[in-house]
Amino acid sequence: MDCGSLVSADALIEPWEETTRTFGRGSIRVAVVDLGEPACCPQHFIVLLPANMYGGRICALVARNALVPNGWTHVGLHEAVSDRPEGGGLRITVPVYGYDPRTGTADPDSRRDISVLVRQAAGTVDLVASD
């Protein structure tokens, strides 16, 4: 979904060296954001593309739920990988972790891999798979 009014610069988590990565020869940036709610799972990630022919930079928010953007307890951006599928584009796969109410932290056994397909020329970011 479009970042729109949901994500502002103050949602970026610091240090940026640990919570942002670039893909596609540096033209595509993925960043972890903290939207503050819900308390158990406020982390999401955004995908930023360079400006297209229509204007400004493209920002896509990747959340667990599009209606009420719930996130995850932890987004493992340092474990993210990318590849180029046969149909074109760039697939970026980011592991995410759910909440463990027993410990109040991320549950290592709850790992899910979320994949998005980025088509930079078209200016699109689409969810393609989640475990």
What are the functions of these language-model segments?
Residues 1-131:
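Exposed acidic/polar residues on beta-strands and adjacent loops within beta-sheet cores, strongest
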